[in-house]
A protein has these predicted regions:
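Intrinsically disordered, low-complexity, repeat-rich polar/charged segments
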Residues: 40-46
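Short, aromatic-enriched amphipathic alpha-helices that serve as compact interaction elements
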Residues: 67-83
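C-terminal-biased regions
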Residues: 4, 8, 15, 21-33, ...
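Solenoid-repeat scaffolds in large eukaryotic assemblies
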Residues: 84-88
């Protein structure tokens, strides 16, 4: 997590604007800190970077806004990594709750939303919820909250993700990327892993978007979006 905090400071020094993409491999001399933007309404080819003009949800001052947003993202990742639902619930917007999206396309009518106390209760209730449908087969995703978290939230060590995007979709599959329209008053941080095994030829990439809205001057979690290659 210290590495991410260092990147926050680097972003401030470089004066990165909204639409920031942090390439963590830059610390090893393998890339550069770059500012790119774009949230397409139609998905590009599988796993390809998303290019285009920056689209931000509001007029939050870029340098301070990005630093605070990245810090909020770190807090959520800490809670997810330690499987601490109580800590996660404390970061959720008390009125809007947090909406879970199993694939990139946000479905405001069907995606499940939990208020903080509901989130804590669901963690221990053993109740299976209908989260949506699997890519390809179209089977119903019926899982308990802990099971869903393992498969569709913290399915990779996102606290060590090699690339981080602020209001920027780094890569996408066949699914529609509609985070900007689904959350017009919010900002998001995307944590991205490229293909992790050579045999998969890049098709095993994955990403986690954490969507935040301002509440009383602080960022509160309102959405968690899982992305991966889809059929």
């Amino acid at each position: 997590m210290k590495k991410t905090a260092l990147l926050c400071l680097l972003a401030l020094l470089i004066g990165a604007a909204a639409g920031l993409t942090l390439n963590l491999s830059a610390l090893k001399g393998e890339g550069l800190l770059k500012s790119e933007g774009g949230i397409p309404l139609e998905a590009p080819p599988q796993g390809s970077p998303v290019e285009g003009p920056a689209q931000t949800a509001n007029d939050t001052e870029p340098q301070q806004g990005n630093a605070a947003l990245l810090m909020a993202g770190e807090q959520v990742l800490d809670a997810l990594q330690s499987d601490n639902v109580e800590a996660l619930a404390a970061l959720v917007d008390t009125e809007r709750g947090v909406t879970f999206t199993p694939y990139s396309t946000v479905d405001s009518q069907n995606d499940l939303t939990f208020l903080p106390d509901q989130l804590v209760g669901a963690a221990t209730s053993g109740t299976q919820y209908a989260w949506g449908y699997t890519s390809g087969k179209g089977d119903a995703i019926r899982l308990t909250l802990p099971e869903y978290m393992k498969s569709y939230v913290y399915n990779a060590e996102y606290s060590s993700a090699p690339m981080i995007g602020v209001d920027h979709v780094i890569a996408s599959g066949n699914s529609l990327e509609n985070v900007a329209t689904a959350y017009p008053d919010a900002h998001f941080v995307e944590y991205y892993f490229p293909g992790r095994t050579p045999a998969a030829a890049g098709l095993d990439w994955c990403a986690l978007k954490l969507v935040f809205a301002q509440d009383g001057g602080s960022w509160k979690l309102v959405g968690i979006i899982h992305s991966e290659w889809t059929i």
